[in-house]
Each structure stands twice: as structure tokens, then as C-alpha cells.
Swiss-Prot record:
GO terms for biological process: translation. InterPro entries: Ribosomal_bS21 (IPR001911), Ribosomal_bS21_CS (IPR018278), Ribosomal_bS21_sf (IPR038380). GO terms for cellular component: ribonucleoprotein complex; ribosome. One of its GO terms (molecular function) is structural constituent of ribosome. Gene3D superfamilies: Ribosomal protein S8. The keyword Membrane does not apply. Pfam families: Ribosomal_S21. Residues 40-61 are annotated as: Disordered. This is Small ribosomal subunit protein bS21.
């Protein structure tokens, strides 16, 4: 969990920007989106295979 303490003489916008940056660095939001709904193991394998195929084609060209 990301934690941001508002510094002295720091605006709320700046603190929010720091918080968003820390959340994106740790990958918290992506992890949440990935786990938001249950995904069957067969669907996980299919997505993994498709991602590998895309990576392979990307390297080829």
C-alpha cells in the first residue's frame, strides 16, 4: 500500500501527484484491475499464450 504524507507548505495537488506516481511505480492499480474479476485458469493460459505470441511477432519485425 502506498503512503504519502503531506509535507509542510505543500499543496494538496502536489501531494496527490506524488501519491499517483508512487502508485503507478509499484503497479498497485494494474494489479487491482487484473484481479478485479475472477479469471478462469484456462483464460489465464490463453492470455499468457497470446501475449507470448505478440512478443514473438514484435521481435521478428
Amino acid at each position: 500500500m502506498s503512503k504519502t504524507v503531506v509535507r509542510k507548505n505543500e499543496s494538496l495537488d502536489d501531494a496527490l501527484r506524488r501519491f499517483k506516481r508512487s502508485v503507478s511505480k509499484t503497479g498497485t492499480l494494474q494489479e487491482y484491475r487484473k484481479r478485479e474479476f475472477y479469471e478462469k485458469p484456462s483464460v489465464k493460459r490463453k492470455k499468457k499464450s497470446e501475449a507470448a505470441r505478440k512478443r514473438k511477432n514484435k521481435r521478428r519485425f
